[in-house]
């Protein structure tokens, strides 16, 4: 509509209070809907439903994004779950690893980011799929994958035994920890990401932005498993 809107880091949904819609022994569904406050930062009416389904040692997270507006709706959605993990100063026999993909041989490609968390699309980085969790890994902030590099991420002990496994259908993912001594690392499946450092376009032109027709519903899912339990 030609108007400029501002938004906080990671969007507004995480700052809203969700309503519990339904609850069973193994499933919870929550929701939020657009209101006057969201319209100040995001010019669409919508409903967002988030479900959690527990089965054994796995939890599946489901997203339903519903366009309740009278026009096409553009959006991004992603997750930011954190898991306890320890980092070492350098790669060694006591170093945990991140496994990227089903086959951890080879490499994957990701974007570097600027100090203000913008993607440098002309400055990519190639990293091993068996990625040591060392103190300098996030010295340049988050690691942001390029398209369809993996649909599975895992945290593994030094002997290679995985203790957290995430499977997802999102096209890109992020890896992040705030400091070298933080006791956790985030595995983040995304539909959408930060803008490129030189991006000046519209919402419709953003990389990885999703579009919903009037009345349309978008479904997303990811699963977290604890294979050692």
Each model region followed by its residue ranges:
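Short Pro-Gly-centered flexible turn/kink motifs
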Residues: 2-6, 63, 210-227
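Extended, loop-rich substrate-binding clefts of extracytoplasmic carbohydrate-active enzymes
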Residues: 4-56
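Acidic/His-leaning functional-site neighborhoods
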Residues: 5-10, 15-22, 127-207
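Histidine-centered catalytic micro-motifs
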Residues: 12, 76-84
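Beta-strand-rich interaction surfaces with strong enrichment in secreted/lumenal proteins
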Residues: 49-51, 207-212
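Asparagine-centered strand-capping/turn motif at beta-strand->loop junctions
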Residues: 63-69, 177-178
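Short, acidic/polar linear motifs in exposed loop/turn regions
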Residues: 69-70, 228
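Active-site/ligand-binding surface loops and adjacent short beta/alpha elements
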Residues: 72, 82-168
């Amino acid at each position: 509509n030609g108007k400029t809107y501002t938004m906080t880091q990671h969007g507004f949904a995480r700052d809203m209070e969700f309503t519990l819609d339904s609850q069973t022994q193994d499933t919870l569904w929550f929701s939020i809907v657009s209101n006057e406050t969201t319209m100040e930062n995001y010019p669409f009416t919508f409903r967002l439903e988030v479900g959690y389904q527990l089965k054994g040692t796995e939890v599946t997270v489901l997203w339903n994004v519903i366009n309740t507006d009278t026009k096409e709706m553009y959006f991004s959605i992603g997750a930011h779950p954190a898991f306890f993990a320890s980092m070492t100063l350098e790669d060694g026999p006591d170093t945990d690893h991140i496994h990227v993909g089903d086959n951890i041989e080879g490499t994957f490609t990701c974007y570097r980011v600027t100090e203000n968390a913008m993607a440098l699309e002309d400055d990519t980085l190639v990293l091993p799929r068996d990625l040591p969790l060392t103190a300098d890994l996030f010295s340049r902030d988050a690691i942001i994958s390029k398209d369809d590099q993996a649909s599975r991420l895992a945290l593994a002990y030094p002997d290679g035994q995985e203790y957290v496994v995430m499977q997802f259908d999102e096209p890109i993912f992020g890896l992040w920890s705030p400091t070298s001594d933080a006791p956790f690392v985030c595995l983040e499946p995304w539909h959408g990401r930060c803008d490129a450092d030189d991006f000046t376009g519209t919402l419709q032109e953003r990389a990885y932005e999703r579009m919903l027709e009037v009345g349309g519903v978008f479904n997303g899912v990811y699963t977290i498993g604890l294979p050692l339990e």
